[in-house]
Amino acid sequence: MFGIIKDWREQRILDNSEFTADDWTRAAERIVILERLNKDELNRLFDLATLFLDDKSITGAQGFEVTDVVRQSIALQACLPILNLSLEWYAGWSSIIIYPGSYKSASTTVDEFGIVHEGSQHRSGEAWLRGPVILSWKDAKHSGERDGHNVVIHEFVHKLDMLNGRANGFPPLQPDMDPARWTEVMSRDFEDFQTHRKSGLDRYGATNPAEFFAVLSEVFFETPQKLVDAYPDIYDIMVKFFRQTPLEQAS
């Protein structure tokens, strides 16, 4: 019964979408990494993005105007990681805040002597546990250009990671995945990345396991060959986690 009601509600949202299929097609054409998707995959992505926009509010900060182009771009890229999962992976929070450019955010760090330092940092995005996703449009508008950097995917992958209670590079895995294998591969390659530079992989990923997972997820969707070249085992487990094969689709 609940499934029937859910399906009916979602179909009603899709039937009353403010954007047509042509609107979504034009939006997708502006995002290079979506070129690898076939027609059926694009249609599913459009449906997911429509449901996403119904479920999440997107508001501007510091006077930023959230246009349809902004909403479509954020929705399409946010939904790419869950294309073969479901919108339920983004449950438990409701808002996205867009700044025109990088913004200052309070930060707390603990040094090697255990002293706590309070300060602020300029950020291009962040994701809060059970809270909003915050993005800089100056950075987000260049996401999806197949250059290995995608702040939208980065922050929304943090949301997937947080489903286990905190961002630690260990999201809830698919039923057919081996948690021990995930831990072994991610831990081994994170340790390697802390001491060895890899072409096409942002050094920010060496910060901690959560950032490692998010940074490599960017590469998985943007420039998958770079990930295969650097860490083939991580590419393989991400294929199983995201249920997507971007390298095969791009060829």
PLM feature spans:
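Charged, compositionally biased N-terminal leader segments and the immediate start
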Residues: 1-22
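Amphipathic alpha-helical packing elements
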Residues: 16-55
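Short amphipathic alpha-helical coiled-coil/interface segments
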Residues: 45, 49, 70-74, 78
